[in-house]
Curated annotation (Swiss-Prot):
This is Transcriptional regulator alnR. Residues 23-53 bind DNA. Coiled coil: none annotated. Transcriptional regulator involved in the positive regulation of the expression of the gene cluster that mediates the biosynthesis of asperlin, a polyketide showing anti-inflammatory, antitumor and antibiotic activities. The gene is alnR.
Length: 407
């Protein structure tokens, strides 16, 4: 008799094993045939995705989740065994150990007694974490929710629980993130930002000696940020400013480089070196605008007149031979000294030497900053700044050569 029972038990186990799902989780979810190769099936290898086998899950479609109406209570046509099982589960939950009851002491009493399911329609066993958490997020992200700062003095959860109630000791202890209110007004910056049409002013009392400027309180770094903001807002690439504005910005940058080179704290700052390289590149680009326009005008005049001709002079009353009825090209970049705009005759006397002198002074300062950046070749920030500064120096040498070709 025992032999018959053992054979039947083995046959039942074999039958149960046959009913267990043998395909991987990915193929089961996609409802496709699985090759059942381990450690990875053919489909998972082809799609380059992880292949996970869960042999304890039975084959067939998963059971349907009960509707909210069925969660309110047992139906009238339930069998006696189901009612008995539910009563057993309830008695088991009520007779839990003291540690579990201590952990559940912070939860609302309606969750433990079953009134929570009757009032909200949510199963406290299956969906207390999922559905309540989703509804909690939906209510907290709305502007009228009680979880945002400044909206209510006594915030509440979506289910009407008071967050200051003694039944909930730490409402945000389980959430490792903070929900901010994007509708709140942003506080104004305390620091003064100069107008965009005004150059940032350097403090006159600043010294270039490292002993006096050893601890500048980040004033040099603030000046770099202000000047970068000035170049970004006032001198966009779409509009080319006048020569005097460019020269004024170039002189201010050289004074700023002197200040940073004399401050050991700011000179050793990685961010300061990177800001200096960005500002220098911008100034070199603006100087290129002047020389590029002048060079193009000279080239066009040479093409028209077939001889070297300076485009900085005022056009004569009579047009040259071969240009009858055509207007000569002149430099349209304005040059102002104070509030007085110089004419074409006054420009040609000193503009060439003036620009050459400024290019030489700027190249010397940029070369000093580059030598400082090469002291840390292993630092990626210093390496990037050194490459930008090297390109700026090369560009300044090219501009000096182009400017010397002027007549």
């Amino acid at each position: 008799m025992s032999t018959v029972n053992q054979s039947s038990t083995r046959s039942e186990l074999a039958g149960n094993w046959e009913r267990l799902r043998k395909s991987c989780d990915t193929c089961q979810e996609a409802k496709v045939k699985c090759s059942q190769h381990k450690p990875s099936c053919h489909r998972c290898l082809r799609h380059r995705q992880p292949c996970v086998y869960s042999p304890q899950r039975r084959s067939g479609r998963p059971p349907k989740r009960p509707s909210p109406s069925s969660r309110l209570g047992p139906e009238s046509n339930n069998s006696g065994d189901d009612i008995h099982n539910e009563n057993t589960i309830q008695r088991t939950n009520l007779n839990a150990n003291d540690s579990a009851m201590t952990d559940a002491g912070a939860v609302d009493p309606r969750v433990l007694t079953g009134d929570f399911a009757a009032s909200t329609g949510i199963d406290p066993v299956d969906d207390i974490f999922q559905t309540s958490f989703e509804s909690f997020l939906a209510a907290s992200l709305s502007p009228k929710g009680g979880l945002l700062p400044g909206s209510h003095s006594n915030p509440t959860t979506p289910n009407g629980f008071s967050m200051n109630s003694p039944s909930i000791t730490d409402p945000f202890g389980a959430f490792p993130f903070l929900i901010t209110d994007h509708n709140l007004p942003i506080a104004a910056l305390s620091s003064h930002v100069p107008p965009i049409d005004q150059l940032p002013v350097l403090s006159t009392g600043a010294s270039n000696t490292s002993s006096e400027c050893g601890d500048c309180g980040a004033k040099c770094y603030s000046s770099l940020l202000q000047h970068l903001l000035f170049l970004r807002q006032t001198l966009p690439e779409s509009t080319r400013p006048s020569i005097d504005v460019i020269m004024q910005a170039e002189g201010h940058v050289r004074a700023l480089l002197d200040r940073v080179l004399g401050c050991n704290a700011c000179l050793g700052n990685r961010s300061s070196i990177l800001l200096i390289s960005a500002i220098t590149e911008r100034i070199v680009q603006m100087l290129d605008w002047i020389i590029e326009e002048k060079t193009l005008l000279d080239t066009e005049n040479m093409r028209y007149n077939r001889r070297t001709f300076s485009s900085w002079g005022r056009p004569p009353r009579l047009p040259p031979h071969g240009l009858n009825g055509m207007r000569r090209n002149v430099c349209h970049v304005s040059l102002r000294v104070g509030n007085t705009e110089l004419d074409e005759d006054a420009k040609q006397y000193f503009l060439k030497n003036f620009i050459l002198l400024r290019l030489k002074k700027l190249a010397v300062k940029v070369q000093e900053v580059r030598r400082t950046a090469t002291t840390r070749p292993g630092d990626c920030i210093y390496r990037a700044a050194e490459l930008v500064l090297a390109d700026s120096i090369q560009r300044l040498d090219y501009l000096r050569g182009q400017c010397q070709l002027w007549e």
